[in-house]
């Protein structure tokens, strides 16, 4: 799927931040009276972990080919011999030696947009694991391209605008053919940040049938949407995907989450080998400002869509040393410091993730990929003090090759108001949306975390990385952490519970998800499990609180960084739109690929503690928990 995800930090209005029960998403769509949750389709993906895959392959008398893409293709053909499909052009080999290949099912030459197959090939060239959400029902016998009885794309655009109450003027819209089958771009519209687009695709419906739809793409700033409008009835919308997920320098150094944890210090040349051009060059041009290969940071007080000519601090000698005081007001009075801090945190996280394997081929955010794979020209556009909102943040993740966009807002929860850029955990949470959306389903598909449970895990991954990075040497497994506490001016933070290994402090279990209906609530459950997992690995391997992990044969040598690496590797292994059980299995498979399952029982025990143990089962309305361990543990 040509996808983009907009993820936000919060899902509740600020007047209820202190309440333990989070409310529905307070994004721009909901302010227009549109409930995007009502358009989410249920999870359909299946995942065959490495153990099950080995048995399956043996039963099929399946042999590998010389090329990992050919081996993966052979598996898809063997699994669905009557289906047609195409190889998505985003395959790569990760730093753990696993090859990742993605496929899209087709019908009559058109994509079935939510029908995906991902195959993971091991170092030995054999199938390691795989997952799929292929359509298994009856393909329509009639080729729609023969009679062409479907509506034109302009009607679909108008249908999307009307159904979602979008601020797009489409009265004079005209469709212009672009590259690709039944692919169009709209001229004569206003209100969108870029020209809306439409593609004719099939979509699996909840009732098990296919619908011919126009996938209408509209970027309206706070929402970057793929709206699936019925191709025979433009008033019917079957599904909506939102790409925006509601994340010398004088800065708060890496590891300091917010101003309560320390003071700004001067840091010289903080980049690592992950940024060979430094943070101020893209390999072609050197920039005396907060711009480089990985990110471009600026203020955006009007909340507008343009950025290239926005204000950013200039320093010919690259000394970004600006004043800040906790009593300074308004936030615009220290915008130089704010932009510098945002630029620093974004680049620092880029470099850490690169060391774990989120590199060019995996779809990271860089202008110049240096002939290392992937699609370039897609640094992260990061806006400080963005005027399009308050008390929140978001990150838009289009597919590889298009820039990500982060909007960081001011928070009106304290006097003086607080700047979200100064809470590193919020920036990290937002950037982690870019990570998970590029890895899950492949760099070319940003629509693989758009179901309720998978979207919840997207929020959970953001909280997990934000929390893992802020750990201090004095911390133990009994240390509890909040999320967003400084910005929200609330020591309990913005989640229902603190992140804690204590079941009394945080009672969330796998079956808690049965009663939750919002992605940030579900994400808190997932991040809680990952917090337990991290501490289990720290107890097994020790903890290091240095800024950069130490690797031996590609394996981080401490439990904290090992947890971050395994969680990230699991994202690339799991199927499009996974559930908790599949994501757990993918982390176990990630450990098998990286350490030959050296941490298998440690991982199982951590998940079993929260009811996601051996025998736990997924059902959208009645998940079954288990505290059991598998044989051998």
UniProtKB/Swiss-Prot annotation:
Needed cofactors: Zn(2+)
Gene Ontology cellular-component terms listed: extracellular region
E.C. code: 3.4.24.-
Subcellular location: Secreted
Predominant localisation class: secreted
Active site: 430
Highest taxon above the source species: Eukaryota
Cofactor binding remark: Binds 1 zinc ion per subunit.
Positions of the pro-segment in this chain: 19-246
Binding residues for Zn(2+): 429, 433
Single Gene Ontology BP annotation: proteolysis
Protein name per Swiss-Prot or TrEMBL: Extracellular metalloproteinase 3
